[in-house]
Amino acid sequence: MFAKTKIAVLAAVGLAHFTGAAQAETVLNVATAGSQNMVDYVKTYLAPKFEAMHPDVKVNVVGTGPGDAGSHKIMEKLSAQQQSGAETWDLDVAVVHQKIGGDMVKQGLLAKYRSDISTGKMVTRSTAENALGTDVNGYVMPMFHSQTAIAYNSDFISTPPASYDELVKWTQEHPKAFGYNGIKNGMSGVSFVAGWIYAYGTDAERLSSLPYDKGVEANWADAFANLKSFNKNVTFTPGNAGTLDMLNRGEIFMGPVWVDMFYSWKEQGKIPPSLKLALIAPGMPGQPMYYVAPKKTSHPELAREFIELATSPAIQAEGIVKRFNWYPGIDAEQVKSELDEATWNKLFAEITPDELAKFGKSFPIAPYFDDIKEGYERHVAN
């Protein structure tokens, strides 16, 4: 059906060198933002799988760089081609961060494809429809979800707090045994603070969707005052890794962490088996990476097939859950039958899929997020 096809996954070193592909071959360019482990995942795991299904396809893989900056390079490339009036664009599939995915939809850079792939119906979390206030329904498929949760030492805590209310009471009874990094040097602490505002200021649904109303922050005065009081009973950590280090050394017995980082450290023996996880009510934020298809891809069918494979239960189970300890982009129940019991229990026994769906929240949209961080600096840190 297809002529000899080459899929090139683009690099941070520059997207421009893909503009002059040889006319004799069909090139499907797939750009991936993210750190080196993301690039390696596409190169050493996804690419061979796709090549096995498409014998005439060759996959060459590099990335566009970590963080939103890597995603922004992809958006800049597509925006330039949009402005040039080109009939087709060089990129056919991209992996981008949540915020940039929303920005790309607003700029009209993406194709609506989710209803055209079989895995599109397997997505259940709201992040497939709302990207920090932008309606992205149909334009994105989550590659994975990262999530924050409360780690605790089960040797000393048999029943962890189930809510922010219970956590406040626990810290009053066990001063300095809970630790987090405030809003400095790591997003685990920022996530905890966002969850605090969801609990005591304005709920997550309102703060993670448009429209923005500057007046909403007037409702947070008590939340910030109570957080300042709460902080008198906690230990401040140096950052994401610092919280895990202090848990490992027994300097604290509870604190917010990234779930994937937690399990990776556990596998490496850097934290003891006695450390476990809980996701407290009314919830804490996490975020996805998205697979997207540019609006003027030359090869829409192959692009959809690539994303469909990447979001299939088998690939999500082996690649996303087992290799990286991420939560799957599709509904976890769709992945369960593809996982051995030990892997499922590791990732879902402590935080069940139901709890993840109920208490896994989005981060606030950018202006509310800024208001929360500025409010913390003004009313809590001082």
PLM feature spans:
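Gram-negative bacterial Sec-dependent N-terminal signal peptides
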Residues: 1-23
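Early extracytoplasmic/lumenal segment of secretory-pathway proteins
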Residues: 25-98
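Paired acidic/hydrophobic, glycine-rich loop segments that form the ligand-binding mouth/hinge
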Residues: 87-95, 236-237, 253-258
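A ligand-binding cleft/hinge motif common to bilobed small-molecule-binding domains
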Residues: 101-103, 256-273
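Periplasmic-binding protein-like
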Residues: 146, 224-228, 259, 271-292
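Mature extracytoplasmic/periplasmic domains
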Residues: 284-285, 289-356
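Conserved C-terminal helix/tail region of periplasmic/extracytoplasmic solute-binding proteins
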Residues: 349-382
